[in-house]
Amino acid sequence: MKFSIITANKNGGRFLEETIRSVISQKESGVDLEYIVIDGGSIDESLNIINSYEKDISKIVSESDQGPVSAINKGLKLASGEIVAWLNADDRYHSGALKRVAQVMAAYPGKALCFGACRIIDEEGREIRKGITSFKEFFFSYSSQFTIQCINYISQPAMFFRRSAIEKAGHLREDLEAAWDYDLTLRLWRQGGGVYVPGVPLSDFRWHTSSISAKRYATQFKEEFDVAVKDAGWPTPQILIHWLVRWGIVGTYTLMAVTRMMRGAR
């Protein structure tokens, strides 16, 4: 079972090497890996880092683009593996993650995607926001089209999908600012549903001040609501639940942001 993993980067040199190493180390467990790196014309140390791993990267593209979604879509067009995913240039896989994914996808050939646990880490790699992680993991055992319409509990760095499924569902929407991964998850789910990869986390999502999730969480949750409405229809029970969850999460994130600002002002 061949994997195609895509990393889109632009001036992400600070964490990029850790990301690359976490991907190429998956080969140690015998995984057939195609690694595609799309760089949007970085002016920091990114290209030096990428070129230093040239022998381990299958395809390197370095040219200007319209942002991360455009870059990932470029990678999706180049992907030739049966199982596809993207890993942002500040996130990382855990050891043996792809081997576990391969085992689950082989056991469930009709499923369009699979997902697992994903830790949230800070800039130093320390786990944070364990409550949010536990909240998402609560829904894993109840995964269905209904529950994924209620709440986006699948963390993108821990989601993998069949290339045949995305060819039917279509690539990422470039008109969305932040919820393009959730929109794709909903469309992929309609191609065969998803299955949970049990056990320890597959990946780490890095939360830092320049990440999309940190800067645009209000926009993200509004867009997530809009794409859920498009997928589930209105009015429906799952959209009412999504609306309630959305405002609960936005309120929590806002309170956390205010608390950080107050601490910084002391």
At which residue positions do the language-model features occur?
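Short beta-strand/loop segment that forms part of the nucleotide-sugar
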Residues: 32-41, 61-64
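Conserved donor NDP-sugar-binding/catalytic core segment of glycosyltransferases
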Residues: 96-130
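A conserved acidic beta->alpha catalytic loop
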Residues: 39-48, 88
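Cell-envelope/extracellular polymer assembly enzymes that use nucleotide-activated donors
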Residues: 2-4, 34, 183
